Regions:
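Glycine-rich phosphate/diphosphate-binding loop of Rossmann-like nucleotide-binding domains
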Residues: 178-203, 264-338
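Gly-rich Lys/Arg/Thr-decorated short loops/hinges at beta-loop-alpha junctions or inter-strand turns
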Residues: 39, 130-133, 171-183, 197-209, ...
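Helix-enriched interaction subdomains in cytosolic or periplasmic regions
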Residues: 113-146, 246-256
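Phosphate/diphosphate ligand-binding glycine-rich loop within oxidoreductases
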Residues: 171-172, 179-180, 217-265
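Intrinsically disordered, low-complexity segments enriched in serine/proline and basic residues
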Residues: 9-14, 18-23
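Adenosine-phosphate binding glycine-rich loop
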Residues: 350-435
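Rossmann-like adenosine-cofactor binding region
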Residues: 324-365
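A conserved regulatory-domain signal marking ACT and ACT-like small-molecule sensing domains
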Residues: 2, 26-114
Length: 435
């Protein structure tokens, strides 16, 4: 549901050298990218047909790795070429070299990351007809007055006669956005809009990205409570865990559905990856020896591992014990769950990388956990049953993920069409039973 350039003009986006124009990104399937390059450092150019040879020469001279992702001719005989670089320095060099060597033959250059960001990634669409005067009257004051009058007497029917049941607030206070220090809320929008896009695609729900200026957990809880009447559920994303926990505590027994990307996403997916790894090696959970490095970063991950039956669980604080003690411990372990991003993990033992700030690429998420493995299904379950997610529902989601994982992988692919429905069905069964 990206914006249509025919109906919307995207603002000029900053480029790697300050002059690359914004445009509309191409749509890509979820396929693995060539090694050595990163689509997050990509550009699309349009050049006159004969200039394609010069582009090839520039790519060959690059100081880093550049791959030609696509190369197509248009009806005018011009060439549209998408180039992926291995990082910022190579991309900056590429832009400068193309401008210098192509001159007027370079008809367009756009940074695909900023082009995609400038669309907002999601747009609203009208559901009610507005073609005739009769259509318009159904969304005018007299019609609204009738529905409001009814809902004032039947408040439990709000979800039946409004769009609230399909609407989700994706909230952040920008306190934990990727590797950044706390940000101004609006600066978090690109990350929140991306998450809204993926959640919408996986659930079909209308997901609204909402950065909020919350100075402390109390402000965050207040924002959630103030917005709750308009949404079926709220999902906290890119928000520090201690603020998530404090906001939950402040809200208390409020009936509004509140999920977060760590407890209802990453922790569930990481637990499923642990079980998948143990299963592939013929180790039963009860006999497994697992260490979680920096467990405070994983939300209820430790509780989830205990709940699925891991028999020997070590919670390892690298600040208190350092790294050498972990190396000495490694020989007795089946697996390490790394939540901090160990620079030199112990050899000889499998390390599951699960640092929240550095998730695996979407197209390679069969090798490591992402919140999107579990969160869409659990969100669907919560909205469908109108019940908060419980520990038992998360455990059911873990087993659904394990069952959907193909041989040789730790987790199912994120674009598996039955992934979210399978997780949702497992959680709904538990929630509907009141567990």
């Amino acid at each position: 549901m990206c914006g249509d350039r025919g109906s919307r003009t995207a603002p000029s986006a900053p480029s790697v050298d300050g002059a690359v124009r914004a445009g509309r990104p191409g749509v890509r399937a979820m396929t693995t990218n060539p090694p050595g390059t990163k689509p997050a450092y990509s550009m699309r150019i349009r050049v006159r047909g004969p200039a394609a040879a010069t582009v090839a020469a520039v790519v060959a001279d690059a100081p880093g790795t550049i791959t030609v992702h696509s190369d197509e001719s248009d009806p005018a005989g011009d060439r549209r070429i998408t180039l992926d670089a291995d990082g910022g320095p190579t991309l900056r060099w590429l832009v400068g070299a193309l401008r210098q060597r192509l001159g007027a033959d370079l008809l367009l250059a756009e940074d695909l990351v900023f082009a995609a960001a400038s669309t907002g990634k999601l747009v609203q669409r009208a559901c009610a007809a507005t073609t005739t005067s009769h259509d318009l009257a159904l969304s005018d004051a007299d019609a609204d007055r009738r529905v409001i009058d009814y809902l004032a007497d039947h408040p439990r029917h709000v979800d039946r006669f409004t769009g609230r049941s399909r609407r989700v607030a994706l909230l952040t206070d920008a306190s934990a956005v990727l590797d950044f220090e706390p940000l101004a809320p609006e600066a978090a929008l690109p990350a929140v809009e991306s998450q809204a896009l993926h959640l919408h695609l996986a659930t079909g729900l209308d997901v609204v990205p909402l950065p909020v200026a919350a100075r402390d957990p109390g402000d965050l809880a207040t924002a959630i409570a103030l917005l709750a009447p308009g949404f079926a559920a709220t999902v906290l994303v890119h928000t520090h865990l201690h603020r998530v926990d404090a906001a939950r505590a402040a809200l208390g027994s409020e009936s509004h559905l509140l999920l977060d990307t760590v407890n209802d996403g990453l922790a569930v997916a990481a637990t499923a990856a642990v079980l998948g790894y143990l299963r592939a090696r013929g180790v039963t959970p009860g006999r497994a020896r697992v260490a979680v490095v920096d467990p405070a970063r994983g939300g209820d991950l430790a509780g989830m591992l205990v709940a699925v039956g891991v028999g020997d669980l070590t919670l390892y604080d690298p600040v208190e014990y350092g790294i050498q003690a972990l190396h000495r411990l490694a020989a007795d372990l089946d697996l390490i769950v790394d939540l901090i991003g160990l620079a030199a993990p112990p050899p000889g033992v499998f390390v599951l990388r699960a640092r929240p700030e550095t998730p695996p690429p979407l197209a390679a998420a069969t090798r490591g956990p992402r919140p999107l493995h579990a969160l869409p299904g659990l969100l669907r379950a919560a909205v469908t049953t109108r019940r908060p997610i419980t520990s038992k529902a998360r455990v059911a989601a873990v087993h659904a993920l394990v069952a959907a994982t193909p041989p040789g992988a730790l987790l199912p692919a994120l674009d598996h069409p039955r992934l979210a429905p399978a997780v949702a069905a497992a959680a709904i069964e538990v929630l509907a039973a009141g567990r």
